[in-house]
From Swiss-Prot:
UniProt binding sites for 4-CDP-2-C-methyl-D-erythritol 2-phosphate: 8-10, 34-35, 56-58, 61-65, 100-106, 132-135, 139, 142
Any single Pfam family the record assigns to this protein: YgbB
Full protein name: 2-C-methyl-D-erythritol 2,4-cyclodiphosphate synthase
One GO biological process term: terpenoid biosynthetic process
Keyword Calcium: no
UniProt remark on cofactor binding: Binds 1 divalent metal cation per subunit.
Gene this protein is translated from: ispF
Organism: Klebsiella pneumoniae (strain 342)
Enzyme nomenclature, EC number: 4.6.1.12
Entries under SUPFAM superfamilies matching the protein: IpsF-like
Cofactor(s) required, per the database record: a divalent metal cation
InterPro entries for the chain: MECDP_synthase, MECDP_synthase_CS, MECDP_synthase_sf
Catalytic reactions on record: 4-CDP-2-C-methyl-D-erythritol 2-phosphate = 2-C-methyl-D-erythritol 2,4-cyclic diphosphate + CMP
Subunit note: Homotrimer.
Length: 159
């Protein structure tokens, strides 16, 4: 078994909505990013790539490449997952923690889990998403941005 950890953060800027876990969430602010700014899927993609020793999202989909301008993070996740599967791995489980003072994530978490399970071709029981605040401390607590951490467990596929 192999474990990977991912982290991502984006500052608020411009107008909303925002996309988190593949879900469009109404909010007065947007997130500044080269792609769609989906911190949850970026952290998850990094965790999966790390577990497979395939680098990180910035290596695979560099923000210096215009091809990824405004990219759909679900597509990036699916492409990373194809590469991981090609290396002979299957999914154990994933756990995603969104860190944001606002907007509230709880109403959107069920759909995030559905999208992630679809993109990874796994059962929803293998996908956990949760959200927390920092009790108004730090940049997320001041409403300056959103952060996310993710962990992933991979297994070598049986032959």
């Amino acid at each position: 078994m192999r474990i990977g950890h991912g982290f991502d953060v984006h500052a608020f800027g411009g107008e909303g909505p925002i996309i988190i876990g593949g879900v469009r969430i109404p909010y007065e602010k947007g997130l500044l990013a080269h792609s769609d700014g989906d911190v949850a899927l970026h952290a998850l993609t990094d965790a999966l790539l790390g577990a497979a020793a395939l680098g990180d999202i910035g290596k695979l989909f560099p923000d210096t490449d215009p091809a990824f301008k405004g990219a759909d993070s679900r597509e990036l996740l699916r492409e990373a997952w194809r590469r991981i599967q090609a290396k002979g791995y299957t999914l154990g489980n994933v756990d995603v923690t969104i860190i944001a003072q606002a907007p509230k994530m709880l109403p959107h978490i069920p759909q995030m889990r559905v999208f992630i399970a679809e993109d990874l071709g796994c059962h929803m029981d293998d996908v956990n998403v949760k959200a927390t605040t920092t009790e108004k401390l730090g940049f997320t607590g001041r409403g300056e941005g959103i952060a996310c951490e993710a962990v992933a467990l991979l297994r070598k596929a049986e032959k």
